[in-house]
Design a protein with these regions (language model features):
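Surface "functional belts" at beta-alpha junctions
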Residues: 22, 34, 89-187, 215, ...
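Patatin-like phospholipase
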Residues: 6-30, 171, 180, 184, ...
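Acyltransferase
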Residues: 182-230
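N-terminal beta-alpha supersecondary unit
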Residues: 1-64
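Stable alpha-helical structural segments in soluble proteins, enriched in small hydrophobic residues
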Residues: 46-50, 85, 103, 189-200
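Residues at secondary-structure transition points
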Residues: 30-41, 69, 73, 77, ...
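DPxDG-like acidic metal-binding loop motif
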Residues: 61-95
Length: 230
């Protein structure tokens, strides 16, 4: 199977092309939210690799967030356009899973350890989930408000590795001895390959027409203003 992978959930724009588990092409740019200009160029480069090998695309995988509204909108709309144009299915991969793959490759001792990818939301808030050392989810994604006591339940029992662009907030607040931080991890398309391949094999496709990514939203609603009686 040949899959095109698109990751645009943060300020990093990333594209990869894979055949089964092998990466045929990978590129990324982390110089800011210039996805609208970069993504089409990166995809054209990937498709040129495909053309030179005289092979056809079987599906497109796109990061589903959580992440930037602008970035995800560009990535998902582009992925949908490709799926319609080629008549192929769409696969979605969680941004938090993409981050966790990288952390699992970095940490050697994974016994009694949790991995917590974090995406920055606003103020002292993040979206986070927990995975064990085998990459199996232990707590589903949730919106968390960061305090000095955050994640005490997990940290009191075991070492927890925090990473992703939301972990900087926690790093300046949390002092628990079991907290570890992996800096500078960003979601990259090349780390979507394993998830996308599994989804394709199991025919776990999303509805191209109706699929919507997990946009970052504000946690709190503003109280409705009341107009005083005149």
């Amino acid at each position: 199977m040949i899959l095109l992978h698109i990751e645009t959930s943060t300020n990093v724009c990333s594209v990869a092309l894979s055949e089964d588990t092998n990466c045929l092409f990978s590129t990324s740019n982390a110089e800011g939210m210039n996805h609208a200009a970069l993504l089409s160029v990166f995809i054209a480069e990937a498709l040129e690799v495909l053309k030179s090998a005289d092979k056809k695309l079987d599906a497109v995988a796109v990061s589903s967030g959580p992440g930037s509204y602008t970035g995800l909108r560009i990535g998902v709309s582009t992925a949908k356009g490709l799926c319609y144009g080629y008549g192929i299915p769409l696969i979605s991969v969680s941004t938090l899973e993409i981050l966790t793959v990288q952390a699992l490759n970095i940490v050697t001792d994974k016994e009694n350890v949790l991995f917590c990818p974090m995406i920055d939301a606003r103020r002292m808030e993040v979206y986070a989930a927990f995975y064990n050392g085998k990459g199996i989810i232990q707590r589903e994604i949730a919106a968390d408000i960061i305090t000095s006591d955050s994640y005490a339940e997990q940290l009191d029992k075991q070492t927890v590795y925090f990473f992703g662009n939301g972990s900087d907030k926690l790093k300046t607040t949390l002092t628990h001895p079991n907290a570890r931080f992996i800096d500078h991890l960003v979601p990259l398309a090349i780390n979507m390959i394993g998830f996308a391949e599994k989804a394709f094999t199991e025919k776990q496709f999303v509805d191209t027409a109706y699929f919507e990514p997990f946009y970052l939203k504000e946690f709190h609603t503003t109280a409705k203003k009341t107009t005083p009686n005149s």
